[in-house]
Amino acid sequence: MATVVVSVDCAAANQGRCYTPELVRVAEEFHVPMTWLITVSANDPMSNIMLYHAEYLHRIPSWHEIGLRVHFQSNGTPITDGRERGMLIQEGKDLLKQCHIKPTAFRAADHMLQVSDLRYLEDIGIVVDATVAPGVVFEGRVDWGDAPTQPYHPAYNDLKARGDAKLLLVPVATYGGQLASLDMEWDALESILDYHLRHSEVISVAARDWANGVANWQRCAQYLRERGCRFVTLSQLASEWGR
């Protein structure tokens, strides 16, 4: 029986459409939790937090989870300086705190986590990260080509090696170079799910609040429920996962 986590990138403030109410409706229909990762960026730290505070936080059930997603770019240029990234992580935590949210789950936008982030994330209380994309290479950005496919604690000097970090990394389910996302074609998503149902203990599925993955979310939830899967939040998985 696989354990499933579904995490949503929340960055709809400047996208023109937000599918959060519909995604929540499906989650309630099947009584499955989701982890909502609200995006903060250097250029626009507030828009998504303000959107969720005004429109959606009161609609998301208390048994779901609210976490943090950071976009490490400034004017289209990746931020690679460790200290600057650490300040942005701290800013994200402080902004969510103003909404009475203490995030313990995290994702780096565009899968651009770097090793210097580990200590900063641990220092603000993050226990689990959902950035890793095994087997996927983002040219000129990151290479997750030989990353582990199941949850692991990384080394402090190598994100793709198992080590002593407190932070648990939960890789997104991938197969054939594609990441499991609710807004992809159903046939492709089904292929990824089927592969991991055969081979994995944990299946991590991603979503984007500005992309219409509602129908696939309904199919996915039913499909996995019928196969005996249990659904948890990212932080719940971290609390259950042994070293």
Please provide the spans of the model-predicted regions:
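Short, well-ordered alpha-helical microsegments
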Residues: G16, Q114-L118, G213-W217
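C-terminal domain-boundary segment and adjacent tail
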Residues: T35, D44, L189-R243
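Short, surface-exposed basic-aromatic patches at helix termini and helix-loop junctions that form
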Residues: R25, L57-R59, V115-V127, Q222-E226
